[in-house]
A protein has these predicted regions:
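Hydrophobic alpha-helical segments within soluble ligand-binding/sensing domains
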Residues: 115-118
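Nucleotide and nucleotide-moiety/phosphate-recognizing core
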Residues: 1-110, 120-135, 141-147, 154, ...
Length: 194
């Protein structure tokens, strides 16, 4: 019998209705899309987050939305991954990236936080940066003096939303592809333009 492997897909964002449509919540939107595709609800409250469990042919897949606020996301990720014994290499994180324009995706096998506080928290808590990521472009600040926190907590223009909606869908597919086919194949298929 084939050994069972557990996977965890994490969408980063801030809890609360007022943050729902902000740039910083692109990860939440993408993981909600995965849940839709798999026909599950992310509604179990534990591990300082909301999660869902999906039984697959090869093991269990967990979908997690940390409810800690962005800067402490790693606490939730560590708790769930430790409990269900999911190693960093099988933790896929979906999150917003201001260095990419809306509609673009970038997949990474590992790496530093690149200035993203949610990723920084996960690296800190796991003690590893060896986890795959799907970065969702949310656009750069309009000018250098613009406050970063204000920017990531702002909402998308109607024009940006047109590019973002299909990118959210592709980010969901990309995360599932990493799990099924590996990061190289997923990068070939999904990195770049929507």
């Amino acid at each position: 019998m084939k050994e069972q492997t557990n996977w965890l897909i994490v969408g980063l964002g801030n809890p609360g209705r007022e943050y729902e449509k902000t740039r910083h919540n692109a990860g939440f939107r993408a993981i909600d899309r995965i849940a839709e595709k798999l026909g599950v609800k992310i509604d179990k409250l534990k591990f300082q987050g909301l999660y869902a469990q999906v039984n697959t042919a090869t093991g269990k897949l967990f979908l997690l939305k940390p409810q800690t606020y962005m800067n402490l996301s790693g606490r939730s990720v560590l708790q769930l991954s430790a409990f269900f014994k999911v190693p960093p290499a099988r933790i896929i994180v979906l999150f917003d990236d201001i260095s990419l324009e809306p509609g673009k995706l970038r997949l990474r096998k590992d790496g530093s936080a690149g200035g993203h506080n949610g990723i920084k928290s996960i690296i800190q808590e796991l003690g590893s940066q060896d986890f795959p990521r799907v970065k969702i472009g949310v656009g750069a600040k309009p000018h250098p003096e613009y406050d970063l926190a204000d920017w990531v907590l702002s909402t998308f223009s109607a024009q940006e939303e047109k590019f973002l909606a299909p990118a959210i869908d592709r980010a969901a597919d990309a995360a599932l592809c990493i799990m099924e086919k590996g990061i190289a194949e997923a990068s070939n298929r999904y990195s770049g333009k929507a």
